Amino acid sequence: MSRSLKKGPYINVKLEKKVLAMNESGKKAVVKTWARASMISPDFVGHTIAVHNGNKFIPVFVTENMVGHKLGEFSPTRTFRGHAGNKKK
């Protein structure tokens, strides 16, 4: 189920403030965040955001194609080790 359009997108307030402050100053520092549910806004383009996956922070460089998606989509939480294969004797 998608979010209601009348509510608007969820963007973490602290994350948005940090990115807007970096846009004004012209800095390009990595911003750490635990807000995986936060929507990527056009202000985030060109910045690197380190998204927590439950174990460590995964750096995500935001491009124009990512706008509208959520940050958690780009930092996988599970590692796929492959299906069980035939045992070789």
From Swiss-Prot:
Top-rank taxon: Bacteria
InterPro entries (UniProt xref): Ribosomal_uS19 (IPR002222), Ribosomal_uS19_bac-type (IPR005732), Ribosomal_uS19_CS (IPR020934), Ribosomal_uS19_SF (IPR023575)
GO CC aspect terms: cytoplasm; small ribosomal subunit
GO MF term (any one): rRNA binding
Keyword tRNA processing: no
Keywords: Ribonucleoprotein, Ribosomal protein, RNA-binding, rRNA-binding
Biological process (GO), any one: translation
UniProt cross-references to Gene3D superfamilies, sorted A to Z: 30s Ribosomal Protein S19, Chain A
Protein family: Belongs to the universal ribosomal protein uS19 family.
Free-text function comment from the UniProt entry: Protein S19 forms a complex with S13 that binds strongly to the 16S ribosomal RNA.
Name of protein: Small ribosomal subunit protein uS19
Originating organism: Parabacteroides distasonis (strain ATCC 8503 / DSM 20701 / CIP 104284 / JCM 5825 / NCTC 11152)
Origin organism lineage: Bacteria, Pseudomonadati, Bacteroidota, Bacteroidia, Bacteroidales
Gene name for this UniProt entry: rpsS
